[in-house]
């Protein structure tokens, strides 16, 4: 049997990225400022973490204009949603001392 920690996602596991993914999982899309405020980090920290999540294919970034101002919207991709679901299941399995569902090793 394989320990559930082996199912943890190294991209999402970092606390800030986990918080970002969890926040995006609860909405269809969030604007940059709202997400920054929800996760309580700086603009530069959010930009850096979003770049890593986007590179992994976990987050989609959409830019547009509201009036004359540039606005950035973020959403969790299907790949990101699946990774978050697996990661949370692994955390729950670790916390409960049981193997993750579907693990027959």
Where are these regions (language model features)?
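Short, hydrophobic-biased segments on the C-terminal half of alpha helices
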Residues: 50-51
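Short beta-strand "wing" residues that participate in macromolecule-binding interfaces
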Residues: 61
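Amphipathic alpha-helical dimerization/coiled-coil segments
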Residues: 1-5, 19-23, 79-105
């Amino acid at each position: 049997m394989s320990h559930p920690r082996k199912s943890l996602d190294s991209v999402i596991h970092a606390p800030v990225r986990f918080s970002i993914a969890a926040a995006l999982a609860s909405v269809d899309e969030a604007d940059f400022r709202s997400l920054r405020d929800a996760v309580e980090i700086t603009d530069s920290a959010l930009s850096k973490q979003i770049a890593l999540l986007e590179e992994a294919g976990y987050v989609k970034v959409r830019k547009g204009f509201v009036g004359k101002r540039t606005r950035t919207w973020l959403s969790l991709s299907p790949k990101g949603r699946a990774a978050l679901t697996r990661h949370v299941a692994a955390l729950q399995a670790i916390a409960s001392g049981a193997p993750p569902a579907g693990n027959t090793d």
